[in-house]
Structure formats: C-alpha cells, structure tokens
C-alpha cells in the first residue's frame, strides 16, 4: 500500500473526494430545491404564501438558507483551519442532516409551522456553510500537488 503522508493510505484521496462531492452536492441542491416544492409545502402547512402577512414566510423559507450560508462560510473556513477541516466538515454534515430530518418531521400547520421550517432551513444553512467552507480544503490536503 502506497502512502501520500505517513499514516494516510493512497485511497484516502478518493474517499475524501467522494465524501466532499456528496456533501457539496447536498448543500448546493438544498439552496434551491425548496423552490420546486413550495406549493406542496404551503399546502401541507395550510398557509397561503400570497397573502400579504405570509409573504415574509415565503421569502425567509427561500432565502434563509442562502443568507446564513453566505454569512458563515468564511467564518467556518477559518474555524476549520484552526480546529481541523475534517472535524468541521463532519460536524457540518451532522448539523445539515439533523436540520433536514427535523424539517421533514413538521407535523403542525399555520404560521408556527412556517417559522419552524424557516428555523430548520437556517440550521441547514449553518451545516451547509461548514460543508462548503471545508470541502475544497480537504481535497487540497488529500491530493498531492502534482495531481
């Protein structure tokens, strides 16, 4: 078995590439996937998004993830440099997954359900920003300079 660094097997780079690609795919898709399902979401929580008082819910449900990701990505990149990129990436994966699962378990309706979904989208944004901030650095660390 050949190694790039002492204690790191050669196939580590391919595992790192696969895992970071999956994480980035999830985080990127999640930034816009809600747009497709908005009619079903608002039907499910029995809320009309086009009523003036409910437009805020619509906007935050769409933009909450992207705002949090844009704000936090640089911070989590630096935190990953200080405490370990893989640790931050794995933590981001866990936070993102917990936010996704919690959002899928919304059983109530009305404005409270919309606020809960917005909060879970923000949690997903925190996890997604950890994924985005550290995935490229993990790949850079895993592959030798000549590849």
Language-model regions, residue ranges each:
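Transmembrane-helix bundle of Major Facilitator Superfamily
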Residues: 2-147
């Amino acid at each position: 078995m050949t190694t790039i660094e002492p204690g790191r097997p050669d196939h580590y780079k391919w595992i790192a590439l696969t895992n970071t690609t999956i994480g980035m795919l999830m985080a990127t898709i999640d930034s816009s996937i809600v747009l497709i399902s908005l009619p079903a979401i608002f039907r499910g929580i029995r809320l009309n998004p086009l009523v003036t008082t409910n437009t805020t819910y619509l906007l935050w449900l769409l933009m909450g993830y992207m705002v949090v990701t844009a704000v936090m990505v640089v911070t989590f990149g630096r935190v990953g440099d200080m405490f370990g990129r893989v640790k931050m990436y794995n933590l981001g994966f866990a936070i993102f997954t917990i936010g996704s699962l919690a959002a899928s378990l919304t059983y109530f309706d009305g404005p409270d359900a919309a606020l809960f979904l917005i909060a879970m989208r923000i949690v997903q944004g925190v996890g997604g920003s950890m994924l985005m901030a550290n995935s490229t650095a993990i790949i850079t660390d895993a592959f030798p300079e000549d590849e």
